[in-house]
Design a protein with these regions (language model features):
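Flavin (FAD/FMN) cofactor-binding and adjacent substrate-gating region
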Residues: 10-14, 29-38, 126-190, 194-196, ...
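N-terminal Rossmann-like FAD-binding beta1-loop-alpha1 element of flavoenzymes
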Residues: 64-90
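Glycine-rich active-site loop/strand segments that organize a redox cofactor
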Residues: 99-120
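Extreme N-terminal leader/targeting segments of oxidoreductases
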Residues: 2-64, 82-83
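Flavin-dependent oxidoreductases
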Residues: 75, 208-293
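C-terminal catalytic lobe of FAD-dependent flavoproteins
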Residues: 331-408
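Glycine-rich FAD pyrophosphate-binding loop
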Residues: 83-104
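Flavin-binding catalytic cores
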Residues: 263-268, 312-349
Length: 408
């Protein structure tokens, strides 16, 4: 997960909230000693996706089309086939599965949306874990809880005590934990593939055509000169291809940044207060989130790169420009949190796309032009558990088994 929520109790205006999240921290001592080594573009996360679907011909027609091969789309595809194995399901991914937010997250698992609890949302963590169990997915899920940390009114016996524009301490503990995002993407894709859904990589859907005169299959997915007819569709592209879901004026895409440290010793982990395995995120600004890894490295994340258009996301190189500046500031912040991190090395630097709606709520609704199309996304960086949970809900809604929520 790439957490960007300030607090479930806060109600920051849109402009103030995003501005404060993208600001760096001034006045920090020291200079960065890391020699950043990463591929151009978004860099490289610690996760490995070890499943690739076999190439296959594009179908002429499917009962259910899923646009987007991340957590949401893959979970929905697998669940539709589980409940209705007689229905054909096609997943159409513009690049490779997990190429967007799902493969570039921090892997933090929380039970609420970035807007807090929502009417009728239900037990996200229980539903997430239950879905993984039913689909046979192993992703190193651990749910020990999560630390909310802040600079005011922290616990006197806080296990965390870091220096970061004040003294960062634990202020609360909430339900949550961590997962291996690469294993989660791979597991969902395997489950969908095993169930009989067809997964097509490099299949960018350019447009949707709503033509009611076509009778049984009024919906047409356009991919260049290729047309794919569908009975229903789920648009799960999150921060990309916003026009498909009609979201270009309803939500804003950004690139969030993170680093992973080299493996630390158990003693260093204990000094940092992270030996419980609980992930953490701040409830005030400047924002910071993170978690430990199986390698005993630690992920730290902060900073948002703004774009005017979602197409600009792929043009970002975290080794240059604004992204590189924010990445350098993040490294310095990490090194100044505690003396045990002063000379720490980094193994990974990366960015991941997120989509933030203006009310910070997930977008989960019918397309404005057709109730045969569901649009789902905009988790504001808090989508690891939520995307799978709501992907399952979307599958049930497409089958007519469940109504969509009213989160307007």
């Amino acid at each position: 997960m790439t957490q960007v929520q300030a607090s479930k109790h806060d109600a920051f205006p849109w402009d103030q909230r995003t501005q404060q999240q993208t600001q760096g921290v001034d006045g920090m001592a020291g200079t960065s000693k890391s020699a950043r080594v990463f591929t151009k573009g978004w860099g490289e996360s610690p996760w490995s996706i070890d499943f690739r679907p076999l190439p296959r011909l594009l179908p002429e027609q499917v009962d259910f089309a899923v646009v987007g091969g991340g957590f949401t789309g893959l979970a929905a595809a697998a669940w539709v086939r589980k409940l209705a194995p007689e229905k054909s399901v096609g997943v159409f991914e513009a690049e490779q599965i997990g190429a967007g937010a799902s493969g570039n997250t921090g892997g933090m698992v929380l039970g609420e949306s970035s807007a807090g609890d929502l009417p009728g949302l239900g037990d996200v963590l229980g539903g997430f874990r239950g879905t993984l169990d039913e689909l046979g997915i192993e992703c190193d899920l651990q749910l020990p809880g999560a630390w909310e940390i802040g600079r005011k009114e922290g616990w006197k016996d806080s296990p965390i005590s870091w220096s970061d524009s004040g003294r960062l301490r634990v202020v609360d503990e909430v339900a949550g934990g961590t997962a291996d995002a690469g294993k989660l993407v791979s597991g969902l894709a395997r489950a969908a593939d095993r169930s009989g859904a067809s997964i097509h990589e490099g299949a960018a859907i350019d447009d949707l055509q709503f033509d009611e005169v076509r009778g049984q299959n009024p919906l047409v997915l356009k991919m260049g000169s290729k047309e794919i007819r569908a009975g229903s569709a789920l648009i799960a592209t999150n921060a990309q291809s916003l026009e498909l879901g009609g979201l270009q004026k309803r939500a804003t895409p950004k690139l969030t940044l993170a680093v992973a440290t080299e493996p630390l010793t158990p003693a260093q982990i204990e000094v940092l207060g992270l030996d419980s395995g609980k992930p953490f995120y701040t409830v005030d600004f400047p924002y910071l989130w993170g978690r430990t890894l199986a390698t005993r490295g630690v992920i730290f994340g902060s900073g948002l790169v703004d774009v005017d258009d979602w197409r600009e996301l792929k043009q970002i190189d975290i080794g240059s420009g604004r992204a590189a500046e924010l990445m350098a500031r993040l490294e310095l912040r990490v090194r100044n949190l505690d003396p045990v991190l002063q000379s720490v090395g980094f193994t990974h630097w990366w960015g991941g796309p997120i989509l933030i709606a203006r009310d910070w709520k997930p977008i989960f609704r019918h397309h404005v032009r057709s109730d045969r199309v569901i649009v789902l996304g905009a988790y504001a960086g808090q989508g690891v558990a939520l995307s799978v949970y709501l992907g399952r809900w979307a599958a049930e809604a497409m089958l007519g088994l469940r109504a969509l929520p009213d989160w307007k």
